[in-house]
């Protein structure tokens, strides 16, 4: 990574997944599940550290589940011998597990790969997007130092991969993928083209570049050769961008920018070179600016979901949310607000709020809400799925 040391420290504090030293959770008796007024809370991977929580976007095949990355310890129920429980190394697999701790889907690194990074469920339940890192020394795989990252998509049905870039991508690219929801993946079709792999050419990719700008690729309109960069928010040229997530209609992104571990903002922006980022304002009653914003669509209604944290806190959860003492909002909360988006409109008409923000959980959940509205997901230390009442 081409980062100066100070910015690297900021990134490590925020993301946790980039640290080579796993967080050591206090040794306590693991509560498998707990029911309270806010719903039923389930541990994911016991009390072990996870990162990059992403709630299942396929409630038919992977209900009550989330996608996550591991460190060097696992507390899940392996589905077969391929999911090894010994010799586990940091980010050596992608895991989808459910509220019972059962692994429902997984993908291991290949022999010429070191680790995965930044996995995220796409807007289409049949695909995941992720980074893969590797490095070679004297012709042999070398995972001990800096890695070279690429971006690829995984088709859930057969675990085949489609490479967008196989190298020279930032470790902090946080890619996201939009695929037309009507696409029906055909595992017998050619997987060497976008249309063959995804079942459509209506595919869009976003990621953060080395020079810290959002890159937007529309495969129905020029693909990688016509990739575009979005303008950064005014006055925030030196702030870092984190996790641009594409809206369900494929026309907008929502994301964070941060100056330091305790100072961040959230923006909505149309996927256009000339678009103006629109800040999600902090209004009365909010604990902080929105953290880890996600889209949520339900029966034709569109929402932005985000976490809030107490003053002087980092955008990172280290609390055991199963502890009733923090289920009063003292560790943060989860908020949702309905809005309407209008592409190809002046910035003052591009979106409008339908109602005020409302709390949906008195704990901070940073991994999104399932399409059926029943579950929220979060990591990092530890991770949880919350079934809402």
Predicted features along the sequence, with ranges:
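Positively charged n-region of N-terminal signal peptides that target proteins for export
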Residues: 1-4
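Sec-dependent N-terminal signal peptides
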Residues: 6-10
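Alpha-helical and His/Cys-centered functional microenvironments
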Residues: 11-12, 53
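C-terminal motif of bacterial Sec signal peptides marking the signal peptidase cleavage site
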Residues: 14-16
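Sequence signature of WD/YWTD-type beta-propeller architectures
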Residues: 20-389
